[in-house]
Structure formats: C-alpha cells, structure tokens
Amino acid sequence: MNPMAYVIESMTPVAKHDNFLIDLKIKNHMAMTNLTQGKATREDMDTLIPMANFVEALYRMGFGRDYATEVSTGLDALHAVGKRGAENGRFILRSAEMRALNTLMELHDAQMDAITVKDMERAFKIVDEEYKQRRMRPIVERTK
C-alpha cells in the first residue's frame, strides 16, 4: 500500500467520485421512492436503514450540526415504519414520516457532497462500532 496515495485519497471529496456517488444516490432514492409509493420491500428498508445510520454518524461528526431535530425525527420515522412493516409485512408511510424521511434523505445528499473519503471512513467506523456494541435501536425488539 502506498501511504502517500492513501493520504491523498482520504482528503478527496466524496463528490469527486462521481460514479460511486451517483450509484449511491440512485439506490437510496429508488428505495425512498418505493417507500413513498407503498411498494417498499425489506430490501428497500435494508437500503434506507444504513443511510439513516450514516446520516446520524456524520451528524455526530459535525456535518449537519444544525439539523438535530430533523435527524432525530427522521430516525424515529424510519423506526416507526420499519416496526409497522415488520409486524404486518407492508411498509407504509404516514405523511409526517414521509416529510421527515425526505428531509433526512436531503441531508444525506448534502452530507455526501460535503465530506471527504476520510470522513466517510470515520462515519463507517462509528456505525460499525455502534452495531458491534449493540447500541443501535432495533426495529424489532427481541424477546427472551
């Protein structure tokens, strides 16, 4: 591994990786479109949940610091629709949840345009650590 190339790459804005960013946005927005149209599948939710976790991690790192309420409301909305979907097999949004998740998606897009590759790596580590430490709020509570 070339340490200098790694340092330079880590300072590169994610937005400079056009193909990656476009693919990510298409995947996220298609999942959101399916959710808003009442056609979301578990796979769509499996796309939106990591997106929301990533928004929260970047928020904690200072990207979108002014959007605390929007991040919290968006996470709550995703949790609620996910929980209902796990119970009845259909992922149907309520209007307030749709607004909250659209705002969360807009914040995610703005964060992706503002961060570097190194920031992305740090956010992934935060999400991974939260998962390993079981600090993430589960959609479905496990009963023992």
Labelled PLM ranges:
Residues 47-81, 110-125:
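Extended intrinsically disordered, low-complexity coil regions enriched in Ser, Thr, Gly, Ala
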Residues 90-144:
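Amphipathic alpha-helical binding modules
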